[in-house]
Amino acid sequence: MQPIISFEQFNFQYKHAAQPTVKDITFHIYPGEKVLIAGRSGSGKSTLAHCMNGLIPFSYEGISTGNILIAGKDPRKKSVFELSKHVGTILQDQDAQFIGLTVEEDVAFYLENECVNQDEMKKIVSESLKKVGMHTFHKQSPHELSGGQKQTVSLAGLLTTNAPMLLFDEPLANLDPASSLHTIELIKNIHKQYNKTIVIIEHRIEEMLNLDLDKIILIDEGEIVAIDTPERILASNILPSIGLREPMYIEGLKRLHFDSNNDVIYPLENLHKESISGVIKEWMEKKAFCKDTPTKKELLKVENLSFSYPNKQKALENVNLSIYEGEIVALLGHNGAGKSTLAHSLIGINKTKNSRILIDGVNINSWSIRKRGEIISYVMQNPNHMITQSTVIEEVSFTLKLKKVSKEEIKFRAEEALKICGLYPFRNWPIQALSYGQKKRLTIASVLTANPKLIILDEPTAGQDYYHYKQFMSFIRKLAKKGISFIFITHDMNLALEYADRAIVLHEGRIIANHTASIVLGHPATLQRANLKESSLFKLVKFSGIANPGKFMELYFDDIRREEGV
C-alpha cells in the first residue's frame, strides 16, 4: 500500500529564521490511519501540519529541502485550493475558521466555490450536518455555539469536501471534558464510517489515547524522536524527557514504584489487578495522613448571590462561598454552569441585588468595577485579549499611569512585578517576541502592580504544554505563599487535583460540591451532574478494587504537596 502522506529527509527553514524549524523529517502515514503528532510548544509540529495542508510555502515562506508527497503529489507544486481537496483542516481557533453568518451557510462555503447547484447544495449541507448531529442548529450563528459545537460545525464543513485526509490542530483546546469526549467520539465515528485518514496535532497525550490511535509521532526541537504504537510509546519513558505529560495513572504507578515486569501498561485494563491492589495497599500503609490545616483569615465571603440575564433563567442561584488568604480554589463545571457569571459578579460587571460580597468583612456591592479591580483582578484566558501596549515594561506600567502614580513609583512597582513573574530580563522586549506562556505571565505581572488580594484566572493553563504548565503553576504557588488568593476557572481535572486547595463545582447556577479536589473529583454523582470526568488515576484505584479509593486520592495528593513544600 502506498502512503497517503510521505516525508523523506525533509527540512524547512522560515524566511527570516536563522536555522531550520524541522530537520531530517522522515515518516509515512497510510490511508485510513489515525495518527497523533505530538510535541511541546515550539517543537515543530505545527510546521509539519502547515506543510501538509499547503500553508507552507503559500502563506509562510521559507526554504525546504528533501521530499514530501501528499496523495502522491508534491504539495509545493500545488495551490492551497488544490490541496484542500485532499486535506481538510480544522484550526485550533474555531472562530478564525468561520465564514458564514449561519451554520448552514458556513458548511456550504466549499460547495459555493465549486458552483454546486442550490438543490444539490442544500442536500449535501443537510446530510453533512446530520452526520455530525448538528442539523437542528442550521439557522444559528456559529458564534452563538459552544466550543464543542463549533468544532462539530467545522467538521461538517470538511465533510462536504470529501477530502480523504482530515487534519486537526489541537482539537481539544478550550473544550470542557464532556465536549472533548464528544469530539473524540465524533472523529472515531467519521473514521469508522468513511475510512478517512486522521492526523492530529496535539500535546495532550492522555485525552488523545481515547481515539484508539494507530501510531504516535513524537517531535522535539524540530526532529522526530520516536514513531511507534501508543503501547510502546507509553512503556518507553520518553514523554517526560521531551516535556510531555504521561497519563496520570502511569505517573501514579511510578510514584508507587510499581514493577510491571515489562507487561503492557496501556490500556489500564491490561494491568494485573491483584498486583495493583497490593502495591497501593503497601504504599498507603507507609504513608501517614498528615494534612496541615493552619487557620487562615477569610478574605472573600459571598452570601446569597443570585443573578439572571435579561429574558433568561437564573444563571446563579443562592451561591454562598468563602475564599481564604493564600488559598487556591478551582471553580469547576460544564459550559454554561455559571462559572464566568460568578467571576463577573465578583468583579462588578454583573450587578446583583439582595446579596452580599464581602472583602475582609467589608460589603463591596456598591463599589465600582475600578475600585473592585484594586482588590480583585481578573485575568482572561487569552492573554492577547488583555495586552494593549507594544513593549513589556509599557504593558506592566499602563494601569499605574492611568492612576497618575509618580514615575519613580511606577518604575519601582513595574520592575518588582516583572521580577516576581520572571520577566525582568525581557522588560524592554516587544510583546510579539514573547511566547504564549510569557504573555500569560505578563498579564499576571500587570495586575500585580495593583497589589490585588484575589486573582481570578480563566483557564490558566489552556494552550500551554506540560513543561510550561509546570513552570506557570510553580509561579502561581509562589504567589499564593505570599498571601495572594486565586480562583481558577478550569476544565482541567488534573490541574484541580494537583494544585487546588479546594474545588467548588457549579451546576445550573448552584454549588453542588465544595471540598478538597480529591474528594470532589472522586464522587461519581458529582462528576456526572457537572459533565466532568474521572481522572485516570482514580480509574486505576477503582480498578484495583481497594475499599476506599477516595482515601487513597486524598493521601496521594497530600503526599505530593508535602514533598513540594506546600
UniProtKB/Swiss-Prot annotation:
Tell me one Pfam family matched here.
DUF3744
Q: How does it sit in the membrane?
A: Peripheral membrane protein
InterPro entries, per this entry?
Answer: AAA+_ATPase (IPR003593), ABC_Co_transporter (IPR022216), ABC_transporter-like_ATP-bd (IPR003439), ABC_transporter-like_CS (IPR017871), ABC_transpr_CbiO/EcfA_su (IPR015856), ECF_ABC_transporter_ATP-bd (IPR050095), P-loop_NTPase (IPR027417)
Localization annotation: Cell membrane
Q: Which residues are ATP 1-binding?
A: 39-46
Q: What is this enzyme's EC?
A: 7.-.-.-
**Binding locations of ATP 2:** 333-340
Q: Which GO terms describe its molecular function?
A: ATP binding; ATP hydrolysis activity; ATPase-coupled transmembrane transporter activity
Q: Highest taxon of the source? A: Bacteria
Instruction: Name the CDD domains on file.
Output: ABC_cobalt_CbiO_domain1
Task: State if Membrane is listed as a keyword.
Answer: yes
Q: Single GO cellular component annotation?
A: ATP-binding cassette (ABC) transporter complex
Name the enzyme group at the top EC level: translocase
Main localization of the protein described in the UniProt heading: membrane
Question: Sorted alphabetically, which keywords does the UniProt record give?
Answer: ATP-binding, Cell membrane, Membrane, Nucleotide-binding, Repeat, Translocase, Transport
Looking at the record, the residues that make up the ABC transporter domain are 5-246, 300-533
Q: What does this protein do?
A: Probably part of an ABC transporter complex. Responsible for energy coupling to the transport system.
Q: Which family does it belong to?
A: Belongs to the ABC transporter superfamily.
Matching entries from PANTHER family are given as:
ABC TRANSPORTER ATP-BINDING PROTEIN BC_2655-RELATED (PTHR43553:SF26), HEAVY METAL TRANSPORTER (PTHR43553)
Report the protein name in the record: Putative ABC transporter ATP-binding protein BA_2641/GBAA_2641/BAS2461
Species assigned in the record: Bacillus anthracis
